[in-house]
């Protein structure tokens, strides 16, 4: 981290599958803001996956680890794909995204869900349902069933196999992610919906009690509601505009955010950031990445949607670089490109022209130039 200047160092890790393709476009966007808007960014590219494994025996080589350690933020592409079979499980696990989340204690994952009017006809949900949809799902990311021990698969005395996992949470693990939700809600519409399954799970009983206690003690000015996860999934599809900030545990957040992606038209549209605890100066380690996976079926074809990665840059501009005007500018440019008909295959209507990954990046860059030009005309 740069402790003596305002310059932000960003480690750019394309990863696997479509990761490098979409990250190439968000890299171009960051460079535009550095060159044209004076954003104080140093970009440092690094490798992850099969290629560095074949060269070094590690999917996460030492120079990539060094780049991420020194970075204020990480721009991540994707992990996984057929090539994972060429990497031994132990090596893959040692450099997994789960291990990175744990290493940097990236406990709060923020996933904005915004329904763009330009995509109303291509989204799976009805246009009337999508009107005014703009909320954020905050997923606890470093605890819960994905990290709980004991876990495993064993053979029982009668020959049957049994798989088991452990779901567990502590007061501090719940309260710190709930605090993130309440603080964010204060900057938005002032509403938090906490999602659990407290009617059957003890971890959810504790979750609800701790979220409620924190609310009563420090955030009584924020409206708090609770939903069971099954009802929350239904409400996201039925009336997503009712939500402002939703906070939930790891596994529920994983599922609900993919469900909510349909309000945006495609997983390819969704950005995210995973935040660590603030240091004494209030700075937080942050990993920015699109929500989509590595999509090995289309990797290398140049047709992936880069907007989830590009909009992750908008989140970076707002959260890490503290440049909300530039974040809004980028979001407006994406809106402008979409309104002009720019579409990759995943968001294109039948018969519509389909842009390549590179062409969509070009469309956003052209829109940035136009938006800035109009701002100067009216200055």
Swiss-Prot record:
Cross-referenced NCBIfam families: leuB
Gene, per the UniProt record: leuB1
Swiss-Prot/TrEMBL GO biological process terms: L-leucine biosynthetic process
Catalytic reaction annotation: (2R,3S)-3-isopropylmalate + NAD(+) = 4-methyl-2-oxopentanoate + CO2 + NADH
Binding site for NAD(+): 293-305
Binding residues for Mg(2+): 230, 254, 258
Cofactor: Mg(2+); Mn(2+)
Name this polypeptide is given: 3-isopropylmalate dehydrogenase 1
Signal sequence annotation: none
A Pfam short name: Iso_dh
A cellular component annotation (GO) from this entry: cytosol
High-level lineage: Bacteria, Pseudomonadati, Pseudomonadota, Alphaproteobacteria, Hyphomicrobiales
EC numbers: 1.1.1.85
Subunit annotation: Homodimer.
Function recorded in the entry: Catalyzes the oxidation of 3-carboxy-2-hydroxy-4-methylpentanoate (3-isopropylmalate) to 3-carboxy-4-methyl-2-oxopentanoate. The product decarboxylates to 4-methyl-2 oxopentanoate.
């Amino acid at each position: 981290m740069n402790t003596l200047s305002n310059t932000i160092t960003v480690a750019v890790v394309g990863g696997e599958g479509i990761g490098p393709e979409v990250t190439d476009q968000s890299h171009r966007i960051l460079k535009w803001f550095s060159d044209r808007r004076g954003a104080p960014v140093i970009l440092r590219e690094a490798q992850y996956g099969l290629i560095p494994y074949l060269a070094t025996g590690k999917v996460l080589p030492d120079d990539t680890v060094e780049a991420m350690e020194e970075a204020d933020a990480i721009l991540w592409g994707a992990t996984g794909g057929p090539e994972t079979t060429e990497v031994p499980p132990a090596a893959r696990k040692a450099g997994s995204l789960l291990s990175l989340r744990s290493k940097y204690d990236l406990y709060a994952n923020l996933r904005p869900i915004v329904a763009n009017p330009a995509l109303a006809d291509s989204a799976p949900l009805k246009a009337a349902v999508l009107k005014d949809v703009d909320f954020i799902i905050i997923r606890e990311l470093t605890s819960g069933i994905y990290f709980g021990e004991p876990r495993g698969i064993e053979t029982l005395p009668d020959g049957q196999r049994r798989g088991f996992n452990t779901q567990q949470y502590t007061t501090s693990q719940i309260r710190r992610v709930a605090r993130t939700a309440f603080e964010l809600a204060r900057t938005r519409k002032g509403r938090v919906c906490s999602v659990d399954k407290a009617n059957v799970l003890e971890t959810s009983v504790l979750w609800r009690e701790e979220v409620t206690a924190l609310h009563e003690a420090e955030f009584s000015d924020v409206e708090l509601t609770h939903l069971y996860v099954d009802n929350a999934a239904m409400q996201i599809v039925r009336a997503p505009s009712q939500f402002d900030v939703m906070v939930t545990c790891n596994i529920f957040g994983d599922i609900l955010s993919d469900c909510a992606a349909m309000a945006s038209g495609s997983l390819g549209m969704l950005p995210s950031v995973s935040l660590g605890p603030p240091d004494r100066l209030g700075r937080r380690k942050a990993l920015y990445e699109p929500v989509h996976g590595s999509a090995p079926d289309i990797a290398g074809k140049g047709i992936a949607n880069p907007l989830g990665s590009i909009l992750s840059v908008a989140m970076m501009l707002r959260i890490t670089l503290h440049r909300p005007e530039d974040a809004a500018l980028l979001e407006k440019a994406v809106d402008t490109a979409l309104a002009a008909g720019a579409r990759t295959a995943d968001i294109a209507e039948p018969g519509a022209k389909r842009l390549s990954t590179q062409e969509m990046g070009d469309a956003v860059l052209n829109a940035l130039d136009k938006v800035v030009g109009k701002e100067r005309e009216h200055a």
